[in-house]
């Protein structure tokens, strides 16, 4: 299915049209059916006038009754068909918007994600896109068909009696002035209501993401109050929006009641003077009744558009967040691909303009092949090195190269295809163990998978699990231990056959036996691959070919363990504790 491309800085209605455009044929068909439905409805008052005239003159009314019955049946059938076509099209518009937005959110730069609440972004995909359904049917089509039906009805009323039409228009224009004052308030209230839904989603995501900590801290009552306050704020804003929408709808209804009473009074006087006959008055009153439907449709379209405009604004805001360029998928490195070299030259970096610098002119060289360890106190900037290599962020100044080529010159997909990355917290996604292992290499064969499972000592775990590799690991891998999650993350990285392997505290939760085994695995991998390790255990650091000592965002020394113990006081102090600082 075709989906709209992200557009920013454009009016909300134009963004809506970009979602509607792929479905314009179906939309036109539904609108045409709605117009035909309206046209058949306009004939009913005229048939009713003929029926009354026939009764007044004692003529047979069979033909008029049959015609009226046929029109009613046809009107109902066409209306039902048109409604189905429009609703189906509206669902397709929602699908297109969700596909566009979800694809865009997956390409968001990490810096943009850092500044937003995940729960609010989820609300934009689930809640805000749902409102496009009503905007498409009630607003876009409702305004078109309702407006045309309104004009056609007024024309027919003018044909029946121009004087009564003037009376009706005076009342309708008065109501329109009142509506013009109400509509902007609906837009503001709707935006605030949807923002409140996003805040509530963010609050819920925050709590569920750390539910064990909340329970262990006995913080349920306080967090419950936070959730309730967010829900109540959403309720207050939604009630405010509903108040103005109800005011708009009832203003239209009141206007039509006033119009009916006024037409009845003026029309009665005209019948009394002989200006018109009773059949004409009845026909005009039927048109007044019929006028209520398109007027309410137009008013509903305007009020619904204000709600949809707020939703489109939130969707547009999300599509305006900084994102990575779209890139074609690229194959992973082949077995035996040459290892990568990495260099940092005077790199300065901070996570946001209002935050202090993490790196203050970091420089180092990592040759192809071998293992390089990064050590230093917490907050020294070690993990940030890996984030910059992956281009989750770009440095403020300086240059980072891979194989002598600036990272900015690499296509992102090609760059990341060369890298295997094991994060500090070793995230595991909901799904099966197999899905998680093959996340970075869906085409991995069974033989390679079995070999990596053995290398990372996961083969025993797979044998113990009830469904083996197909066992579901739970939300964020809650059915696995911390050490098992780390081994899954390492196996996942190895299955990508990386030219550069980044291990950030990759063995921090492993027992001594598993750590020793994986240490041997990493040493073996380092013979053919470039391995960068952030580690806090001395046993891991001492096996590195070179060690980069970082402190306060600077590289203070580079060398082997033996060299640094005597040459660098900070490293000597860290080594003496037998436990290097975690984090940073």
Curated annotation (Swiss-Prot):
Residues 342-577 form the ABC transporter domain. GO terms for biological process: transmembrane transport. One of its GO terms (cellular component) is plasma membrane. One of its GO terms (molecular function) is ABC-type transporter activity. Keywords: ATP-binding, Cell membrane, Membrane, Nucleotide-binding, Transmembrane, Transmembrane helix, Transport. Residues 27-307 form the ABC transmembrane type-1 domain. ATP binds at residues 376-383. The chain crosses the membrane at residues 27-47, 61-81, 140-160, 163-183, 246-266, 271-291. It is a multi-pass membrane protein. It is found in: Cell membrane. PROSITE patterns: ABC_TM1F, ABC_TRANSPORTER_1, ABC_TRANSPORTER_2. The keyword Protein biosynthesis does not apply. This is Uncharacterized ABC transporter ATP-binding protein SCO0742.
